[in-house]
Amino acid sequence: MRLLGSLILTLSLIASAFSSSVPLTLCMSGRAQGTESLNKSGSCEYGAYNGPTGPGTLTATLNEYFYSSGVKCGDCFEVSGPKGKTVVRVVNFCSAGTCPSERPLFMLTPDAFQEISSDPLSVVYDAGFRKVSCDASGPIKAQVSEDSSKYYVKLLIFNNEVGIQSVTIKGKDMSAPVTMVRQGSAQFVWSQAGKEMMFPATVVVSSQYGGSVTMTMNSLSMDILKFSGNFVAPKSSIIKNAPASCSLSASPLAIYQNGLTEGWNYWSSRSYSQINTTDSSSHSVGSTKSLSLVLMGSSSALTLARSGDFETTYFTGIKFNMKANTTMSGLRVYFPNEQNKYWTPSSPITTSWATYTVPFTSLQHKTIESAFTFANTENINVHINIDNIHFIASPSSVTTGYANGNETANSGLATTTVASGGSGASGVATSSHTGVSSSSSTASSTASSTASSIASSTASSSASSTSVSSTTAGGKTTSGGSGISTSGITGSGDSMAASTSKTTSNPTGKTTGMTGSSIDHSESHSSDEHHSSSSIIKASLLLVSAALAFASL
């Protein structure tokens, strides 16, 4: 019985190994949301989900920006959200006039989206994703299109395990194979003026990672045709030490910058009035607008929530500028589900603008959170203005699960830490400040991606004030980006990829310490931070790497 049990376990492990998807790129940043399943053909022309050529219900619609004129039809991607991960096959695209096209967008069917998010109506703005092999069963298949003729042969090719590089056809009377043309879908066409296709014809489909399969066509019958096999997914030398899955990608640093940035809302706030998210009547130096509202009594609070949640391990805290119409002694900042451990400033909020830093070590939190709260605990109505709300990037953010410093030379992977920059969208480097100077100076740095970069959003960090309140203890602290990993990948499909996967920076999990009391009253002043020329060069190289990585997908 013990031998039988061991045999069953071994067979199970083998089956699991063969059924799991193989990572083909590093982790990157995108956006994911739910959509309805197609009941008829999408732009890839696979037909109904439950039809003979259908791809099933775990599928994705891409935005036009990422669809690449049909090149990604049939490719599989692992998409990660706050709940978990799913693997989907690309079957459709959404035009630029209908869907956002600044960065990769995955519109997932209900069966797929419920695997990454508990809220079917949410948008996961910081989804992680990577290209993987598909869990295809059986050989690659094809079907002749009904509008084909002996002068015009159109084939739908499906059930491929990895991406298709090319398709050729050689008729009975041809001296050499002819490349079929992709029709912005999973369909490929042969047509030559005045020439007929003579049967039998040989069709060869080549993989993006090397290797090919063949099939012989004897007629234009619309029966399902089977190739000689399926592509073999690369099992090694693609992504070394790949993590089990991608985590949520790093949120952009800016939460409020002259308005709430994309993905943030205040809808969970309570007991407030007169809210204005773009109040131009009062703002700190360097800004043009602030978020203003009246907090009404001791149970009132401003809660800022991010759709699709955010991962705290990329950051060490938040910072913001704030003032009130009267002295306010009862401000508390905390994560909504962890109210018993909070941060409060060492001195009351006054009628003058001041900058505050809240280290996450002062708060009890999980790896993934959805919001944070600014609460009023006094039995008064107080009008507050708040602006320049930013995450503070970890000073030592390094991606995990990829090559470390000792492996880089041999693996073709590079893991980079930017000591003086923070992590913006998709790992693009930007600067972060933990405080402001005591004068009315402004320090800011912005890194924005190019049109071919992974992310379109701009992560910016600024700090300005005429007075300084509670900031992180220990003086000026520089913040680091999550880094970009690039990979030299064998084959023509994916040569490089940028990583925005989970970081090893603290804090991780829940912190311990004082509860139910004012925490971290330490203060320090910091002067404006200046990038060295080497840091600027590193940031520039990161931007170039990110652009090349995404363009190669």
Swiss-Prot record:
Gene3D superfamilies named in the record: Expansin, cellulose-binding-like domain, Galactose-binding domain-like, RlpA-like domain
Write out the biased-composition intervals (Polar residues): 497-516
- How does gene deletion manifest? No phenotypic change.
Identify the gene encoding this protein.
expl7
Span list, region Disordered: 421-447, 460-531
Q: Which CDD domains match?
A: DPBB_EXP_N-like
Q: Where does the Expansin-like EG45 domain lie? A: 41-139
Per its record, how is this protein called by name?
Answer: Expansin-like protein 7
Q: PANTHER family annotated for this entry?
A: EXPANSIN-LIKE PROTEIN 7, PTHR31836
